[in-house]
Amino acid sequence: GSEMCIRDSCTSMERLLITLILVCTMSNITNAQNPFYGQYHTPHGTVPFDRIETEHYEPAILEGIKLQNAEIEAIIQNPEKADFSNTIEAFEASGELLDKVVAVFGNMLSAETNDDLQELAQKIMPLLSEHSNNITLNEKLFARVKEVYNQKETLQPTQEQKQLLENAYNSFVRHGANLEGEAREEYRRLTNELSKLTLTFSENNLKETNAYQMLLTKKESLAGLPEIIIEAAAETAKSEEKEGWAFTLHAPSYVPFMTYSDNRDLRQKLYMAYNTKCTHDNEFNNIDIVKKIANTRMKIAQLLGYKDYAEYTLKKRMAENSESVYKLLNQLLEAYAPTAQQEYKEIQELAREEQGDDFVVMPWDWSYYSNKLKDKKFNINEEMLRPYFELEQVKKGVFGLAEKLYGITFRKNTEIPVYHKEVEAFEVFDKDGKFLAVLYTDFHPRLGKRAGAWMTSYKDQWIDKKTGENSRPHVSVVMNFTKPTENKPALLTFNEVETFLHEFGHSLHGMFANSTYRSLSGTNVYWDFVELPSQIMENFAIEKDFLNTFARHYQTGEVLPDELIERLVDASNFNIAYACLRQLSFGLLDMAWYTRDTPFEGDVKAYEQEAWKDAQILPVVPEACMSTQFSHIFAGGYAAGYYSYKWAEVLDADAFSLFKQKGIFNQEVADSFRNNILSKGGTEHPMVLYKPVSYTHLTLPTNSRV
């Protein structure tokens, strides 16, 4: 229940780039030095990060655009009648160089960015947006796609071919192919504008986060803080040649400070810094950008014939429409609100015992007093557990879980190039010993890395039609976990252990991918289905049999004691209603921005407070603003999609019941989950995939039963 940024498990930067896919002719430079050209001579053809310089991106992207344009021209000029192979498959296979470069570029913007890269992005993103438009608005190309689509009854396609054809046709229509004249030009203008706005939004967010530090110089200001946090703050200050202790807005610094600091004024100061990000009078202000993004998306949706952006988005989701989303959010609201009120009351009572009867618990008091109450009720807190969650051990535990469930093994390979010295690369092998995937891990905060945690991919899986070769994926998990200090290894909080399991769940979805076509493989699924593989893994975090496989005290080697595990399990539902309401409030805020059918010109903060008022328990802080830093919905793929976490929670709780029933390491259940969900990607409708792993045949708010 900390105020940290919501767990950001955007399954990849591609989502930001889906909307972007090109135009320019200036690049005949076949620069022999450019590592993007030709095959990569690295283990498994991994990205040669050690050879890529900033100046390589632009020429390679321009060249990629040129090549894809030529490939598309060849599809259009083909004298043969349009068919599945010469049109749909040919289009699916186009743009290989471009995809390759954009995957690296997009991922570096999130994980290891700098001013040069950001400046380049301002130039490149509009080009990509324009290229994407040139494809979907290409009338001759669409005519051929439509021709194949209209013969779909006679084609007798396989399930994958059928899905690919549906997706291709829909993708054109959803990106303006049926628009005419003025409307086409307007669509181009709006999408171009949107790509610039979302980019600026996230840059502002990163810069504002990095710009802030609270430097404390008096020892007494540190009252209540655990030693490990004080040490880290001293090292942060020292790294910048400052005296004292520096606290930042990065989660490993911010969250513990809000939880443990006895100094209320300092908690308030740090809270306000975090919760007013991008609202100040400086160049990182996102207030206008929020309005522009919401309004631009609304206009795009209306241009395409929808009432609002949510209707446009949800048409291609399990939820299908706004009504289903509101139905889910409101059901949960009714279920949780009374309990959350009760939780607040208990915390208020505890605070008043200490502070007197007129004390009001404010948002900057919540983590502090809720931690005290948890300690009092369950005799447990994050710091008690931390020594048992040393990062290397946790990694062994998480990899070991995948080995137990799926028989896969992980081998670190230092020959695989990485983009930062803290990143590690692993080869992953299937139970028959065959090479399965490459997995990169990147655990700690850096100035060039955005907040949150996410899984992403450098190369999707697909099967080469000509050779039959199964080209395996390269995926990465990126976190912002507690760093090691001079005299302590990286000791994680329980919350960080859960986050690791969550992102690792996404990575299994990527690594087990087994589809013919790359656009259907891995995490390329309906957005409200994508969180099922990640969230089901979080359930293992409080399973004793799993914790026993790895949780050891980093100094004594002592196993995490049973009674501590029991207290952890007992406490796992502590303040759960408040935490759920918080997620619901973000879902309501998201829907409020994207169910508008008239442009927004009002006050962003007031609108936000109105949108989520039913889910708010704590007193309102008028200066605070979530929207200006809500990257999920303004820069990532979660616009009109934040409810997906809650939607998938219904699914994952149901599917995990099978593990609970048959044993948490049961291989039969694991195999079924792998074969029906993890390896299938987006090759069928999620409801079809989900049926075999369902425990109760639950009913979802759309009324479609599993």
Where are these regions (language model features)?
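Short pre-active-site segment immediately N-terminal to the catalytic Zn-binding motif
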Residues: 484-499
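Short His/Asp/Glu-rich catalytic/ion-coordination signatures at enzyme active sites or charged loops
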Residues: 41-56, 105-124, 148-189, 248-288, ...
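Short, hydrophobic/amphipathic alpha-helical patches that form generic packing surfaces
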Residues: 97-107, 166, 170, 272, ...
